Regions:
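Fungal secretory targeting signals
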Residues: 1-23
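Active-site catalytic motif of lipid deacylating hydrolases and related acyltransferases
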Residues: 23-108
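Active-site nucleophile loop of the alpha/beta-hydrolase fold
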Residues: 36, 142-153
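Extracytoplasmic/secreted cell-surface and envelope-processing proteins
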Residues: 40-43, 76-77, 120-124, 154-158
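Membrane-helix exit/interface motif
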Residues: 98-102, 124, 130
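Gly/Ala-rich beta-loop-alpha elbow adjacent to hydrolase catalytic centers
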Residues: 112-118, 122
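Conserved hydrolase catalytic core segment
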Residues: 127-140
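Lipolytic serine-hydrolase domain surface
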Residues: 150-174
Length: 174
């Protein structure tokens, strides 16, 4: 009888404990995509969609998500959000999304694909220029960044290193 009396409070406390969260399945490759200015969030990746899909096909099991940010340039249809505000919000969204994902899936290789303002927000998150930047394990998890039509691009500068087949991007000066 004493065993039952002692065991009952123990089992009762276990029943009231928070349920165990199911483990998330982590892909080997995860792609973050970002659309260009004036393309609605409903269009997800914008012009970068084709490339996002090509990378997913090249790496079976790879998954992706679009960065949620305004992608505005001051137009009325965007509530007048300026380009500067939009790219700052986008950069913050990148840092938050990549960091959060990396915490959940620390061994997943991350690919960033963006076009125009979408490329710029990834550029900012990697190299600085608009608020916070990726750091630590989240930065180390980024294995590829494809920035097409990036407004920050200036031909001939030292950070224009490599090609699609060799080397890569070195960090911009902050």
């Amino acid at each position: 009888m004493k065993v039952t009396t002692l065991a009952l409070p123990v089992f009762a406390s276990l029943a009231s404990a928070n349920p165990v969260e199911p483990r998330q399945s982590c892909p080997q490759v995860y792609i973050f995509g970002a659309r260009e200015t004036t393309v609605s969030q409903a269009n997800g990746y914008g012009t970068a969609a084709g490339l996002v899909n090509m990378v997913k096909q090249a790496f079976p099991g790879a998954t992706s998500e679009a960065i949620v940010y305004p992608a505005c340039g001051g137009q009325a249809s965007c509530g007048g959000i300026s380009y500067d505000q939009s790219q700052r919000q986008g950069t913050e969204a990148v840092v938050r999304a990549v960091t959060d994902f990396n915490r959940r899936c620390p061994n997943t290789k991350i690919v960033l694909i963006g076009y125009s303002q979408g490329g710029q927000i990834f550029d900012n998150a990697l190299c600085g220029g608009a608020g916070s930047t990726l750091s630590g394990s989240a930065l180390q998890a980024v294995k590829a960044a494809i920035l097409m039509g990036d407004p920050r691009y200036v031909a001939g500068l030292s950070y224009n290193v490599g090609t699609c087949q060799a080397q890569g991007v070195s960090h911009l000066s902050r």
